[in-house]
Amino acid sequence: MMEKTWRWFGKKDKITLPMLRQIGVEGIVTALHDVPNGEIWTVEAINDLKSYIESYGLRWSVVESLPVCEAIKYAGAEREQLIENYKVSLANLGKCGIKTVCYNFMPVIDWIRTDLQHPWPDGTSSLYYDRIRFAYFDIRILEREGAEKDYTEEELQKVAELDKVITEAEKDALIDTIIVKTQGFVNGNIKEGDKNPVSIFKRLLALYKDINRDALRENMRYFLSAIMPVCEEYGVNMCVHPDDPPFQVLGLPRIVTNENDIEWFLNAVDNPHNGLTFCAGSLSAGEHNDTRELAKKFAKRTHFVHLRSTAAMQGGNFIESSHLTGRGHLVDLIRIFENENPGLPMRVDHGRMMLGDEDKGYNPGYSFHGRMLALAQEIGRASCRERV
């Protein structure tokens, strides 16, 4: 059976380790959230958190994430030093017995949603992506040069119609959702309390004005080639998270979006320590992806699994659905991974807001009751499968 893990945001997380022990969690997915991006994770700091986790009868199974700084992605002047620091952190993790590291190579912005509490008929809510509202943010709020070329005439007309009715409060909420609330708690570039987040965001976008898809791919290859000797020496598996959503946004290149992209980076640095975080939610948000076929093809190079599902809607919109439904096909994925690469760490990724979760101040997507329900569903499925 897959290892049942849970993303936990450290000692300040409102969801405590004793709570997780009680609901069947075995492994913890976490990071040194107090260490600034690009600085070295010391053996002392790693072991301190590891010992704390183990004191509650749990284990630190996966690092999510050891952030890859922007200067590595766009090949800035600080790249070499940042890669050296990254290599030291990986070595220290390996020395401490933590062997799986999830990361992403998305420029500037991590996962993108436009609504953090989109209602369902049953009274729960989940994360939602509205393409027209995102286009409005891109064209009318960011005022990105050439943005209109990335949208159809019909979409541009809908943006114009939205501009007539959207309120200032709704604009502020859109900014907060897209570049603050969903980013800051995952080692993002903009955090709660930052002044003029739009200006900061525009400066970050400008860093990539000369970086196209090929250049970003080459920078990823360079990074992976540099760190693989350390991964081999200490037995650390790197597993890149797919782009979320898996298509180009804001004129930025995205290079982990589909079967060809995954095949490219696995072949570019063909090493068993260079692998994939199979995020069913991210991949299923693209209608071009069939998660079942991708799992069959890449199971052997998968080191970590995120179980989450989405439902595609009209106009390029999507919503995070129940773990029992949607385009993620999670039942099939569990079967595939158990057959092809058994024992992988798995975490239920995101969950609906329910039973008062929305009042607890949890990070977006990371409810307690919603994820607990999803975990119980996945444990039940896996247990049934073992007995059939």
Label each region the model flagged.
Residues A31-N47, L250:
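Glycine-rich, proline-tolerant flexible connector loops at the mouths of alpha/beta enzymes
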Residues M2-T5, G10, P18-R21, E54, ...:
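Histidine-acidic metal/acid-base catalytic patches
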Residues D13-N37:
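N-terminal ordered "arm"
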Residues D34, P67, P107-V108, P245:
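Conserved beta-strand edge residues that scaffold enzyme active sites
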